[in-house]
């Protein structure tokens, strides 16, 4: 009969239902693993540029993520190739216990540092918005574009 087999040297029938059930369970688990590993490729790269009066006041370059959504940022690169200031301050802000806080600040010199700045080089997990700002000490930087590029990966629960 289909679904049954005989064990050698035994006259009794053994059902394959347990084996079939176990295989179905394994298929379900394999599908769940595939969904998670497919996510490892991350999203398409995010790229853009922001124009602002960088010397007048600290201005937003980009906001990454969304409230209540868990992400990993694998790379955040800014390009200051259009700027001429000798003190280009990059700051990152995120909520800590419900209040936005500055969590990173570094100064660069557009006249001597590389024009591509690897602000995040590695993985950084966030569960809300990461706000990236920039400020220059040179009025000639007002109205200039600052390019950005980042890689994001949604974290599954």
Describe the role of every protein-language-model region:
Residues 1-44:
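Fibrous stalk/shaft segments of extracellular and virion attachment machinery
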Residues 11-13, 51-54, 58-61, 100-105:
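Tryptophan-centered short beta-strand motifs
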Residues 44-69, 82-87, 115-116, 140-142:
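Surface-exposed ligand/attachment interfaces on beta-rich extracellular proteins
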Residues 49, 136-157:
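C-terminal interaction-tip segments
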Residues 59-96, 133-136, 151:
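Beta-rich globular "head" domains
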Residues 63-64, 79, 106, 119-122:
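Beta-strand-rich interaction surfaces with strong enrichment in secreted/lumenal proteins
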Residues 71-76, 122-146:
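Noncatalytic modules at the cell exterior or secretory-pathway interfaces
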Residues 87-120:
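Terminal beta-strand-rich extracellular "head" domains
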């Amino acid at each position: 009969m289909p679904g049954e087999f005989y064990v050698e040297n035994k006259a009794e029938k053994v059902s394959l239902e347990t084996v079939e059930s176990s295989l179905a369970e394994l298929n379900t688990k394999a599908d769940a693993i595939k969904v998670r590993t497919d996510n490892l490729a991350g999203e398409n790269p995010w790229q853009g540029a922001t124009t602002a009066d960088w010397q007048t006041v600290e201005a937003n370059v980009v906001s990454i993520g969304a409230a209540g959504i868990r992400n990993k940022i694998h790379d955040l690169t800014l390009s200051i190739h259009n700027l001429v200031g000798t003190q280009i301050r990059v700051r990152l802000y995120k909520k800590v216990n419900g209040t936005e806080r500055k969590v990173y600040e570094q100064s660069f010199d557009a006249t001597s540092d590389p024009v591509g700045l690897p602000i995040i080089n590695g993985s950084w997990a966030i569960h809300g918005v990461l706000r990236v700002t920039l400020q220059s000490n040179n009025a000639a930087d007002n109205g200039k574009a600052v390019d950005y590029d980042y890689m994001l990966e949604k974290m599954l629960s």
